[in-house]
Amino acid sequence: MAHPKRKTSKTRRDKRRTHYKATVAQIATCPITGEAHLYHRAYWHEGKMYYRGQVVIDKSEAVA
């Protein structure tokens, strides 16, 4: 197996890690509810779950 001949310095290690960074999440605003949410994710608003502008689950109604 390969192993390093020399210890990697803190500077070299940190320079390499500058490219490892988190991206900023894109946030959408629903045209129906006006709620801010992540793209491609369902979200709750006033007891209803919305996805792509449509109600998917409605918890406000009683299930008989």
Curated annotation (Swiss-Prot):
The keyword Ribosomal protein applies. The keyword Nucleus does not apply. This is Large ribosomal subunit protein bL32. GO terms for cellular component: large ribosomal subunit. Belongs to the bacterial ribosomal protein bL32 family. Keywords: Ribonucleoprotein, Ribosomal protein. The gene is rpmF. One of its GO terms (biological process) is translation. One of its GO terms (molecular function) is structural constituent of ribosome. NCBIfam families: rpmF_bact (TIGR01031).
